[in-house]
């Protein structure tokens, strides 16, 4: 059975001349192939984790640090960092990565919407990913977290290479609209007691 949270938006990136997959919020992807994993981040965070020896890597894209239902059980949804990090690491290991060879690069966590500055969702996501990786003893080799700008991210899992572009000037509100849309979607799909 295919996991619906496994990214499936494949395309050929002509600028980079390589097969690619675009990750949306709540998705993850693991591969052994030579390709690029791409996403755009606002307050969300992506962890790019790879095995430096076997060259197996993957990325997630989560919206909120973690969540539990009213019974205290974690919600199994990759929109939440706790689940997104766990499933990414499990899939890497299942595909042949070794825990002791895993390293990470982390990005995002920007407080890009004026309303998010007070709730600091981006900062909460950034703190969460750093704490999670420290607890699992996966070193962070590089990253770009927090701030006020969205980011466009390209991760090459076989080499660990990252291309990052901060989107400093945005004359449209596409990212803010997406953040609001995914926040509403998240609230509508997480029901108390589930």
Swiss-Prot record:
InterPro entries in alphabetical order: CheD-like_sf (IPR038592), Chemorcpt_Glu_NH3ase_CheD (IPR005659), Cytotoxic_necrot_fac-like_cat (IPR011324)
Functional note: Probably deamidates glutamine residues to glutamate on methyl-accepting chemotaxis receptors (MCPs), playing an important role in chemotaxis.
Protein name: Probable chemoreceptor glutamine deamidase CheD
Pfam name, any one: CheD
Domain of life: Bacteria
Record-listed E.C. numbers: 3.5.1.44
GO biological process: chemotaxis
HAMAP family: CheD
Keyword ATP-binding on entry: no
Family: Belongs to the CheD family.
Reaction catalysed by this enzyme: L-glutaminyl-[protein] + H2O = L-glutamyl-[protein] + NH4(+)
Keywords: Chemotaxis, Hydrolase
Regions annotated as coiled coil: none
